[in-house]
Design a protein with these regions (language model features):
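Gram-positive cell-envelope targeting signals
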Residues: 7, 12, 72-75, 128-130, ...
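C-terminal peripheral helix-coil segments that are non-catalytic and often amphipathic
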Residues: 60-63, 104, 108-116, 130-174
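Short secondary-structure transition hinges
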Residues: 63-105, 127
């Protein structure tokens, strides 16, 4: 109703709440990643050392914490909801497609690191990104939702996220 449409109209377009939730999350991520692509196009990956691209990605997560807490919180809730509902991979095709830009960047960044040696590649690519980038995003999401033990409501935890970023960068450099 807040969007100016009724339930009937909504469910004419989406057959279930799960389908709607997936569509909204895919649209939100695509819009955010398109904004990042405009700032630093995928085509520039060859021109930038892999570690600089890696730091840019970590900084973009901190920026999300500062300016897009709603996206981080929605994504966190999305992950729990989709898991709870038992969404099948075929239901997530559009969502995964919305992450194409990020997944492509991560892969090209890792390949660039193999060439320029600016961050470690002794760990398999998927594990490296789970341990580094995904951990950073999870921390940003938890801070955005005030899910950190001992955290105070409405406090800015950017300094702690910058510290975490520095720790991750030091790990990545080996």
């Amino acid at each position: 109703e807040a969007a100016g449409i009724g339930r009937a109209t909504l469910f004419r377009c989406y057959s279930s709440k799960l389908e709607l939730v997936i569509a909204v999350c895919a649209a939100k991520w695509k819009a955010y990643l398109d904004e990042l692509d405009a700032k630093r196009p995928i085509s520039s990956i060859g021109d930038i050392p892999a570690i600089d691209r890696f730091v840019f990605t970590l900084d973009s997560y901190i920026d999300m914490y500062q300016r897009h807490k709603d996206l981080l919180q929605y994504n966190d809730n999305f992950n729990h909801y989709v898991t709870h509902e038992g969404a099948a991979q075929e239901q997530l095709v559009d969502f995964n497609r919305s992450l194409y830009s990020a997944n492509t960047r991560f892969h090209l960044m890792y390949e660039k690191a193999k060439e320029d040696g600016t961050f470690r590649t002794d760990i398999p690519e998927d594990i490296f990104f789970r341990v580094t980038l995904h951990s950073m995003m999870a921390a940003c999401a938890h801070y955005a939702g005030d899910f950190i033990w001992g955290a105070k409501d409405n406090k800015d935890y950017t300094a702690e996220l910058i510290l975490l970023k520095e720790m991750i960068v030091n790990f990545a450099k080996g």
